[in-house]
Amino acid sequence: MTSFFAEFVHTSDGVTCSDSGLMDLSTEEECSGAVNYAKTFNNNARYRWEVYGDMYPKGCFISESGNMYFNKYTGSARSSFSGISICWKGNT
């Protein structure tokens, strides 16, 4: 693992960064920059696009199929979408 990858960490399926005491990636650019890290646990990882809605996890997330998205929604509603969040390593 390179030092760049060491900056990222991912959650279990359905668990958000904040649930884990981790920091959300805050921009679409940060999320698309995490693709190589995501490929360490999902060979199909590829960044797709930005989304906005309370049905998705906040910040950067990856689906089981490998599609990665950045959710701009900042509200407090809980996600009903199953996905793995990609976070910055470190505490909030």
Model-predicted regions and their roles:
Residues M1-V9, R78-T92:
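Short, structured beta-strand segments at or near domain termini in extracellular proteins/domains
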Residues F4-W49:
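GGW-centered surface loops in extracellular recognition modules
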Residues D19, G33, I62-E64, K72, ...:
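Disulfide-rich extracellular modules and peptides
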Residues W49-G75:
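Disulfide-stabilized extracellular beta-strand modules
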